[in-house]
From Swiss-Prot:
Belongs to the G-protein coupled receptor 1 family. Disulfide bonds join C101-C193. It comes from Mus musculus (Mouse). The gene is Or6z7. Odorant receptor. It is found in: Cell membrane. This is Olfactory receptor 6Z7. It comes from the Eukaryota. One of its GO terms (biological process) is G protein-coupled receptor signaling pathway. Residues 51-69, 113-141, 217-241, 297-312 are cytoplasmic. InterPro entries: GPCR_Rhodpsn (IPR000276), GPCR_Rhodpsn_7TM (IPR017452), Olfact_rcpt (IPR000725), Olfactory_GPCR1 (IPR050939). One of its GO terms (molecular function) is olfactory receptor activity. PROSITE patterns: G_PROTEIN_RECEP_F1_1, G_PROTEIN_RECEP_F1_2.
Length: 312
């Protein structure tokens, strides 16, 4: 009772202070230039991918439909997290209002959840293409692809609504300094002045269901693909089948290795500097590299790109 009264008398935090990626004055300007360049490059690359898919009929296939969704998602990723990162590097400490912080958290969780489900959908598409090629036109017809994409986005939205509501309803009485470059789950839970056991449980369960559930679904698809590829009679056929999956497998490996380490742990390891570095990988580096990874391994995208460059 006394604790409840004490908490009620405390002033609720109206804003948070983001420490940013680095507080070293001697490298902040250089980092700002680097990350601004990466931001613009990411937007350019993913916009180009979406344009190629929309403007070339030979890319109007399920695999590229999902790739277009992924490119859109990557653009949203950097647009949600990069502004506060850049402002922190430009101004030093960045003050973000409570509502803005929760809004950023909401959209970030939406994107993480959506990407998990979307990557699993892309793995299923490759599974059907290689393991059940005769049924591919039926199993991956446009209505199914659209449904999988909608499930991905709505699934991320649902998870985010639950998690963000739990975190936003906690009490934050001070201190209000977040050791991160954007509003993320773990730093916010560390600042709450109320019990967070229930919120941590919700966070952990959602991580298990979304991260591990989609990861295991993706891996099951690739195990089946691997078995099918090994049974193919010719080396050429095996190489062709594997090449259609290699890019996606690289993207999946990078994404899940980082996100599972950060979010799917039963106990938060106090290593925020490490978490910030890992967060940079999947919020900045991965969105920039994904279009390059897909273009380097995909001849159809390369042909479409060459045609576009020739027309221009």
């Amino acid at each position: 009772m006394e604790r409840s009264l004490a908490l009620a008398n405390m002033t609720r935090v109206q804003q948070f202070i983001l420490l940013g990626l680095s507080t070293r004055l001697d490298i902040r300007d250089a980092l700002f230039a680097v990350f601004l360049t990466l931001y613009l490059l990411t937007l350019l690359e993913n916009t180009l991918i979406i344009y190629l898919i929309c403007s070339h009929k030979e890319l109007h296939k399920p695999m590229y439909f999902f790739l277009g969704n992924l490119s859109c998602l990557e653009m949203c990723y950097v647009s949600v997290t990069m502004p506060t990162l850049l402002m922190g590097l430009w101004n030093g400490l960045y003050h973000i209002p409570f509502i803005a912080c929760m809004t950023q958290l909401f959209f970030f969780i939406v994107l993480v959840g959506t990407e998990c489900i979307l990557l699993a959908s892309m793995a299923y598409d490759r599974y059907v293409a290689i393991c059940r090629p005769l049924h591919y036109p039926v199993l991956m017809r446009p209505q199914v692809c659209l449904g999988l994409a909608m499930i991905s986005w709505l699934g991320g939205l649902l998870v985010s609504m639950i998690k963000t509501t739990c975190i936003a309803t906690l009490s934050y009485c001070g201190p209000n300094v977040l050791n991160h470059f954007f509003c993320d789950v773990s730093p916010l839970l560390n600042l709450s002045c109320t019990h967070v056991a229930l919120t941590e449980l919700v966070d952990f369960i959602s991580a298990i269901v979304i991260l591990w559930g989609c990861f295991l679904t993706t891996m099951a698809s690739y195990v089946a693909i691997g078995r099918a590829v090994l049974r193919m009679p010719s080396t050429t056929a095996r190489y062709k089948a594997f090449s259609t999956c290699a890019s996606h497998l690289v993207v999946v490996g990078i994404f899940y290795s980082v996100t599972i380490f950060i979010y799917a742990r039963p106990k938060r390891i106090e290593a925020m500097d490490l978490n910030k570095v890992l967060s940079v990988i999947y919020t900045v580096v991965t969105p920039m590299c994904n279009p390059v990874i897909y273009c380097l391994r995909n001849k159809e995208v390369q042909v479409a790109l060459h045609r576009t460059m020739h027309w221009s």
